């Protein structure tokens, strides 16, 4: 006796032979190549189902992890006109998804017998000549390899293509890169066919229903408004040819009058109810209220069937309060990234060996690649990531204690990181010119070898040089940078109507004002140029606003360098009296009659001198001079 655990109802017939779904079953009807081609070429939804995932999988391509000269040689081979690997892989993936399979033929210079296996170890520099993409219908497959000890198990024993003069040529499976569309899991059902199904096979009904719904809704548009005319004795007119001619002439004339005078001419009394007589005219309109939701449902089903989010498939904005679509796109890109690892990388393994040997003449074991991220970061997110990497490296280098890693090794790793992610354009060329951190000559401590002028003596640019602290005793700290192009800045201020301004020598930007005592030596150093200067480029967001309770009027501006430097000192123990840090230059403490809302902010570049470390002067305001 067989017992089935299922829900049944003898009253409604659910789960019994009376169930309306009892006779339903699945059947498989393969789509032919002609219909698949017609769908891809003639239906926008089917075309997107085929093209979107290959386009996203190959859009950012991959990053080789090797020395820069090696990377340049490898990429030169990949981008050669007859190879163009990224484009060829994209095309092969589309063909495989459309027809169920495709191959990329690997053309090697000097090959005589294509039926012989391709040994990547025999490839020399420049031996890779070209790559050709062929669909499953352009090649004939030999018997499927059934030997489980063979590396080509489950693949054709050979591929046959048309050669010169149409003569068939057999190609060993090691000489092609094989792509399969939707894999057939039960190989017994396909016999000797080594290919998969088209991805359109499983989504056919969903795509067709979405297209049909769109077409039917479009067909309703001409019927949105229909004129209905009631005519007494209409049947009598249609009995004879003369009557039908009179009927046609009657309504032709009525329609002409409607077009000329925007009026409907009818024969009748115009009365209502019992008094009604003669012809009657009315309009019927079709309601489209629920049709957009219905069409959207069909399109959403098609998107789900294709495993592509609607925001990507339909190029539409996400719906819902505070919806951004980021989660949908992240899931989509995660899917593409997973496919890169499970579909592309294994398929390209042998070809990659050929590319490396053709580019370098050998196969260094340390070289590998990583798929480039598909999710792009905004400029703000990139800056935040850059800061986190820099802060992490500073922590590993021992900002507050001993280093956790060898500093030179950490520097080399950081240079490679910033080069690969493009955070610092031109870094690689600069390293080649100036050398790495390990290449720099060791310098003795400035505190031990630099003679300091006595207190009160003037240093460069006539500025009093402060005595350096020769110990690491914690003390309050004030760090600033002088504005070098102060005269240009003050010229702008005078043009804007400021009668009194700070002197050029007093113009500066504050980086740190720590009332808490800190170890000055733990503050690190700035990332400016060799001369210690920092230039904030012209333009960008700038405002002239009052600041604080002292009547100061300042120019607010943005500088990632200053912000990161400030945060680095905060993390090293410096205090700050305000909720956040905003770089600014004080213009004046006496605004006078100037209407700040009418002031045009200074747009030129700001050039600041080296950082100045000094103790906090609580009487700093008494030393300010305005002119």
Swiss-Prot record:
Pfam families per the record?
Acb1, Phage_portal_3
Q: Where does 3',3'-cUAMP bind?
A: 105, 614, 620
Q: What is annotated as the active site?
A: 508, 510, 584, 586
Residues given in the record as 3',3'-cGAMP binding sites: 105, 614, 620
The record's keywords, sorted A to Z, are: Hydrolase
Q: Where is this region: Disordered?
A: 437-474
The reaction(s) catalysed by this protein are:
3',3'-cUAMP + H2O = U[3'-5']pAp[3'] + H(+); 3',3',3'-c-tri-AMP + H2O = A[3'-5']pA[3'-5']pAp[3'] + H(+); 3',3',3'-cAAG + H2O = G[3'-5']pA[3'-5']pAp[3'] + H(+); 3',3',3'-cAAG + H2O = A[3'-5']pG[3'-5']pAp[3'] + H(+)
Drop me one GO molecular function for this one. Answer: hydrolase activity
InterPro entries (alphabetical): Acb1-like_C (IPR056175), Acb1-like_N (IPR024459), Phage-assoc_HI1409 (IPR006445)
Q: Which domain of life is it from?
A: Bacteria
Function, as annotated, reads: Counteracts or regulates the endogenous CBASS antiviral defense system. Phosphodiesterase that enables metal-independent hydrolysis of the host cyclic di- and trinucleotide CBASS signals such as 3'3'-cGAMP, 3'3'cUA, and 3'3'3'-cAAA.
Say which family it is in: Belongs to the anti-CBASS protein Acb1 family.
Q: Which NCBIfam families match?
A: phge_rel_HI1409
Q: Give the miscellaneous note.
A: This homolog of an antiviral immune evasion nuclease may be due to cryptic prophages, or it may play a role in regulating the endogenous antiviral defense system based on cyclic nucleotides.
Q: What is this protein called?
A: Anti-CBASS protein Acb1
Source species, please? Caulobacter sp. (strain RHG1)
What broad taxonomic lineage does this protein's source fall under? Bacteria, Pseudomonadati, Pseudomonadota, Alphaproteobacteria, Caulobacterales
């Amino acid at each position: 006796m067989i017992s089935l655990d299922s829900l049944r109802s003898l009253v409604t017939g659910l789960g019994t032979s009376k169930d309306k779904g009892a006779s339903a079953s699945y059947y498989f009807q393969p789509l032919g190549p002609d219909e698949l081609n017609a769908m891809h070429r003639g239906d926008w939804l089917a075309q997107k189902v085929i093209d979107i995932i290959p386009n996203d999988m190959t859009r950012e391509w991959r990053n080789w992890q090797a020395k820069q000269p090696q990377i340049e040689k490898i990429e030169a081979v990949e981008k050669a006109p007859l190879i163009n690997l990224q484009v060829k892989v994209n095309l092969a993936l589309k063909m495989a998804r459309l027809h169920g399979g495709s191959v990329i033929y690997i053309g090697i210079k000097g090959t005589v017998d294509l039926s012989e296996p391709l040994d990547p170890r025999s490839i020399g520099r420049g031996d890779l000549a070209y790559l050709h993409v062929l669909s499953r219908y352009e090649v004939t497959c030999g018997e499927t390899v059934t030997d489980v000890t063979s590396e080509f198990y489950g693949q054709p024993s050979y591929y046959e293509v048309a050669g010169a003069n149409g003569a068939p040529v057999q190609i060993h499976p090691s000489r092609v890169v094989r792509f399969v569309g939707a894999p057939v899991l039960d190989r017994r059902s396909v016999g000797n066919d080594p290919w998969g199904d088209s991805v359109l096979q499983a989504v056919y009904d969903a795509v067709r229903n979405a297209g049909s719904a769109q077409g039917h809704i479009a067909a309703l548009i001409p019927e949105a408004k229909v004129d209905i005319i009631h005519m007494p004795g209409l049947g009598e007119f249609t009995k004879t040819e003369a009557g039908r001619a009179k009927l046609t002439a009657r309504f032709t004339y009525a329609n002409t009058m409607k077009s000329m005078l925007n009026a409907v001419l009818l024969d009748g009394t115009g009365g209502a109810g019992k008094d009604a007589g003669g012809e009657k005219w009315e309009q019927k309109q079709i309601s489209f209220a629920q049709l957009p939701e219905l069409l959207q449902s069909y399109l959403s089903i098609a998107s789900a069937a294709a495993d592509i989010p609607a925001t990507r498939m339909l190029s539409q904005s996400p719906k819902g309060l505070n919806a951004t679509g980021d989660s949908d796109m992240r899931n989509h890109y995660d899917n593409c990234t997973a496919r890169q690892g499970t579909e592309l990388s294994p398929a390209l393994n042998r070809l990659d060996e050929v590319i490396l040997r053709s580019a370098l003449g050998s196969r260094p074991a340390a070289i590998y690649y990583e798929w480039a991220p598909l999710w792009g970061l905004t400029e703000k997110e990139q800056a935040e990531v850059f800061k986190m990497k820099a802060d992490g490296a500073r922590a590993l280098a021992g900002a507050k204690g001993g280093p956790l890693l060898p500093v030179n090794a950490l520097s080399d790793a950081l240079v490679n990181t910033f080069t690969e992610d493009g955070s610092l354009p031109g870094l690689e060329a600069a390293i080649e010119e100036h050398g790495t951190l390990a290449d720099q000559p060791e310098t003795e401590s400035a505190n031990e070898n630099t003679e300091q002028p006595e207190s009160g003596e003037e240093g460069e640019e006539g500025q009093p040089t402060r005595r350096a602290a020769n110990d690491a005793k914690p003390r309050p700290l004030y760090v600033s940078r002088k504005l070098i192009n102060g005269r240009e800045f003050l010229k702008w201020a005078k043009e804007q109507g400021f009668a009194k301004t700070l002197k050029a020598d007093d113009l500066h930007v504050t980086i740190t004002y720590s009332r808490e005592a800190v170890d000055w030596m733990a503050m690190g150093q700035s990332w400016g140029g060799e001369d210690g200067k920092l230039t904030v480029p012209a333009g960008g967001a700038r405002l002239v606003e009052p600041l604080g309770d002292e009547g100061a009027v300042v120019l607010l501006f943005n500088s990632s360098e200053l912000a990161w430097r400030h945060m680095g000192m905060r993390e090293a123990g410096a205090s700050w009296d305000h909720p956040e840090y905003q770089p600014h230059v004080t213009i004046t403490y006496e605004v006078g009659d100037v209407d700040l809302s009418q002031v045009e902010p200074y747009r030129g570049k700001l050039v600041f001198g080296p950082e100045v470390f000094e103790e906090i002067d609580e009487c700093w305001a008494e030393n300010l001079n305005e002119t």
